[in-house]
Design a protein with these regions (language model features):
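Short, well-structured active-site flanking segments
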Residues: 76-90, 185-194
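Soluble non-cytosolic domains of exported or imported proteins
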Residues: 59-68, 102-109, 117-121, 132-140, ...
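C-terminal segment of classical bacterial N-terminal signal peptides
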Residues: 21-29
């Protein structure tokens, strides 16, 4: 297992358990306000130095921030032009949704947009199955990537973040992951979108989806990622 001191990287994230990620350093105004999150970790963008933290190494549920890894693994293993046909099981996924319908066909890029902008659990499952052949195989890739990055307090059990006792991370590990992911140009472009047109290829129907991450509207320089 890697020592925590060696896990510091060129990352830049302010992370909480139900996490808002903002690249850069805390402003004086933000530093003066008491943090109410149960856990957070703020890293310097260039040095990987932990500027401030609270319970940064405590294992907690990661919820929809799971999709940061889902998007990263998909981008590293498949082209954005890959077409995905939605199954009945995926269309009925519980929780936050793109409201996909069985038989619909989308590009991987549009599913990644829906997954990050509106946190579609249905899209996450469809992406996982198509990229790796099965959800289990995709989750294996997620855990392998976590080990590569140095996420020592993280284990993935699904690609969407619904509750599982075997699905957890820490604020520090999320900071590592987000800093790593933002080095991927396509990932950075997708998560920083304020809105996007999502096209179903069979019918040609296009829906506009708006990013639910209020940080990108409220703070100059915020690059998005997940809340």
């Amino acid at each position: 297992m890697m020592k925590r001191s060696s896990r510091l990287r060129r990352a830049a994230c302010a992370c909480a358990v139900i996490t808002a990620v903002v690249l850069g350093v805390c402003s004086p105004a933000a530093a003066a306000s008491p943090a109410t999150a149960g856990a957070y970790c703020v890293m310097d963008a260039q040095t990987g130095e932990v500027i401030c933290q609270k319970n940064a190494y405590t294992r907690m549920e990661m919820a929809s921030t799971t999709k940061v890894m889902t998007a990263l693994v998909a981008l590293e293993n498949a082209p954005l032009s890959l077409t995905v046909r939605i199954t009945r099981a995926e269309a009925g996924t519980e929780g936050s949704s793109m409201y996909l319908r069985a038989g619909d066909v989308y590009t991987l890029e549009d599913l990644l947009l829906g997954m990050t902008l509106v946190s579609g659990n249905d899209a996450a499952l469809a992406v996982a199955r198509t990229v790796a052949g099965s959800e289990a195989s995709f989750v294996r890739l997620m855990n392998e990537k976590a080990q590569e990055i140095g996420m020592c307090d993280t284990h993935f059990d699904n690609p969407h973040g619904l509750h599982s006792q075997q699905h957890y991370t820490s604020a520090y590990d999320l900071a590592l992951l987000c800093g790593y992911a933002m080095q991927n140009a396509e990932f950075c472009r997708i998560v920083s979108c304020k809105s996007a047109g999502i096209k179903e290829l069979t019918s040609g129907e296009t829906r506009v989806m708006v990013n639910k991450n209020r940080f990108i509207y409220a703070f100059e320089g915020a690059d998005g990622i997940k809340i």
